[in-house]
Amino acid sequence: MGVFQKLFGRNTDAFYAPMAGKAVAITEVPDPTFAEGMLGNGIAIEPVEGKVYAPCDASVDMMFPTGHAVSLISDTGAEILIHVGLETVSLEGKPFKIYAVNGDRVKKCQLLIDVDLEAIKAAGLSTITPMVICNTGAYSTFHTVVGRNVTNEDVVIELAE
């Protein structure tokens, strides 16, 4: 049972960490597109391993051909964007191996992308990985868990309508 459901008895949606690492506030992402919430509210992960997992049961709306980002639609309608690293589109897909394609149904904690974090670092790019809920405005309550180490088995975002 989530924090909001315990407190208010409301239905909530829970989203799990897409990667293992330290969960940080979206405002700490060194890219204004994410830090200023232009794409929605969320969290970011400073990853310690190169595996990207589905944060919930969802459909793959768009797996970018380069593998640097994936857009999902949760079974409850949340629009989720996971962007692996910053400016990583410039790597033309080299450090990424994709395990899902557009239209696929995925389950919570299902592997979506393998990424070579060392290759991203060697290119001088950040590995910080934002996960944002693009339709944040559809929810009355938005709770994030940041400032601690997480795995794909930890809830990092809870939403209530």
What does each model-identified segment do?
Residues 1-161:
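Contiguous, well-folded functional domains in the mature portion of proteins
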